[in-house]
């Protein structure tokens, strides 16, 4: 009997091994690669001495992932499932338990590779998120209120926006407005009249979004009732609802492969819209790490890890005002994406441009570079309002101003002196002035599928710009070269041609220039 069991185990093991597919990319001289995960942005491009690795089934580095790699020499790789990748030296090694690899040459450039893979696997949808995301700043109550979301302070924050001369736009009320996780009703002690609050915010010129997640507190009545209906992930090998550990504790998780569970959750959100006039939702979580096939069972028997991430994003797309952080296989969908929480630090600032480029090259072009100054609330703890690095906040704001979207959270009027506040106000207005152009680029992306924020090598191949990660093109028109350190000077690589900068000076391209950048200035260059 033992021998039979051993034989069966060995046979099963052989099946598992045979099901795993592998691919090895030998990086050519001068070739660079992008892809796999937005969170690896600062490690891109691969092949220039940088190392990177990820296991897409297990984790996502707090952001979007996609089963693609694309190269500066026109090569593109697609996998029909999540893969494990290690990029080091002149090789990229990949394995997948759930998919097969397709490595193909689409042309000679990064743009050729992206467009080839994109048209084949996530073509343009023709749809774009609401224009307000692109034409006005977005605001989020997270850093100011953290877990103390309440009606009085939400209104105070909104009033601060208006009183300090910032444009109104989308306003997101973040985590802990609700009675409990999965109990999507305002906490009465914190929000005595939520309908009146939403009406007032609308009258002030805001659209209102609420934070939501796929978790449900196990010890709530809602959790117990929904568990009986079978709406949650099951503990592996049992009929009991699974309990997962996430950043706010222990919870059940909706199994969105169950059509009834999905319909129920969608109705919960739609009901908030009907009763309170809510415009949309910030869809947090959905990360594949909460849906491991090793730990849970799912309704349809197949939608594990990234498949549930995709189902969460698809639920988000049912609401026009949405925001995602985790995503899978929804390139070119009309989903607002956000870079994962960045620290209040200069490293956090340096991560913004590479992250935005990485997101765009996966098809996630309608993206916001996190929150101005950072969205990781713990890095704001213990700092007196007059002790913030004002230059860091301003430089972060400047980067946001020439991105598809910009998002404030920490209130600049609370932590900045008059001079630095004036600068932030000016760049919020500048973003609005660029609104028509940014919106036109968003609409063009909806038709062509090409990213709004582009790597220099994407727009200017063959000019040795593959390694440039601190400047970018916003559409075809603007080369943006923000300051991402505490210095007031930087080098700018100008592609061939003529360029007019933000001061009106015309430069001859095809060279590197060094420019002075006082705190008031965001360097940008218009192609002539």
Locations of regions flagged by a protein language model:
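Short, glycine-/Ser/Thr-/acidic-enriched flexible segments
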Residues: 75, 82-84, 144, 178, ...
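Catalytic and substrate-binding clefts that recognize carbohydrates or anionic sugar/phosphate headgroups
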Residues: 19-136, 151-163, 459, 514-528
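Active-site pocket-lining segments that scaffold enzyme catalytic pockets across diverse folds
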Residues: 149-152, 156, 171-176
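Aromatic- and carboxylate-enriched substrate-binding clefts and catalytic-loop regions
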Residues: 45, 167-428, 459-460, 475
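Bacterial Sec-dependent N-terminal signal peptides
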Residues: 1-21
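N-terminal small/glycine-rich loop or linker at the start of catalytic domains
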Residues: 130-144, 240-253
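Carbohydrate-binding surfaces of carbohydrate-active enzymes
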Residues: 160, 164-165, 187, 197-207, ...
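Generic recognition of flexible, low-complexity loop/linker segments
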Residues: 54-57, 64-66, 126-128, 159-161, ...
